[in-house]
């Protein structure tokens, strides 16, 4: 409880500092101070977009709260924020809740990314098909030797970022299907902590957002890729190197990488203020170029892929 209170005090202090930056500035499409909520799996993309937006519009200050997708959307439903970056649109029930209060929010698709699976560099297993993944996540397969005899990595330790994260929801909805997620899965806290855990644990299988490892320009991304292996995933019954794919931008574009998902801005801004301006930036040409350079698939720009590397 004390940690949670301290976190919110820090957010309020940050908001106060930003207000100092824009003291006396009226909120418009491109000025003022707002707090937004961001699914933590999308924080690298959000951070770069917000930094460029604030540099372009120096009378605007965006205070991001990086949290689980469930908490981010709950903040929007409670009218605590007017802008959320998430990996799903609003549901019919959520829309009905807004409409009953005379609010008419939007779900704006701005990109496609995916779920990346990472394993320890000492692990010989880095190719999976969807059927094997379903058995791993549901607890039917619990040891690496059941996937590859003689693998020697022991027990499979599946690790997510947060119990309420979008990655957990994706695995439950899109991989497990009607099967329950195994209680053997556990949460590390954040995507960075998932990467750290996998880097030091030979038997770990980590589940993270692709944008944590997709930006070749980012030295932190390159450091992460030196610490772990990014798994290949296949739709085929028998996964081979030739029919399995890593989450490259090109394979997100063609759909050959199976674990894709869309990124949405959830906007409830009846006054058409700064949240609407931020949305127009993300979905406009400059914001979409940032998506492209981050190694993700933009929603509204053509993709010109000229080269595909052999390894992430």
Where are these regions (language model features)?
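Sec-dependent bacterial lipoprotein signal peptides
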Residues: 1-16
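Residue-level marker of intrinsically disordered, low-complexity segments enriched
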Residues: 1-3, 108, 231
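Amphipathic, positively biased hydrophobic alpha-helical segments used for protein targeting
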Residues: 9-11, 95-97, 306
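Exported/periplasmic ABC-transporter solute-binding proteins
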Residues: 18-58, 62-65, 69-70, 74-77, ...
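Pocket-flanking alpha-helical
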Residues: 70-101, 216
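Periplasmic N-terminal soluble interaction domains immediately after the signal peptide in Gram-negative
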Residues: 102-106
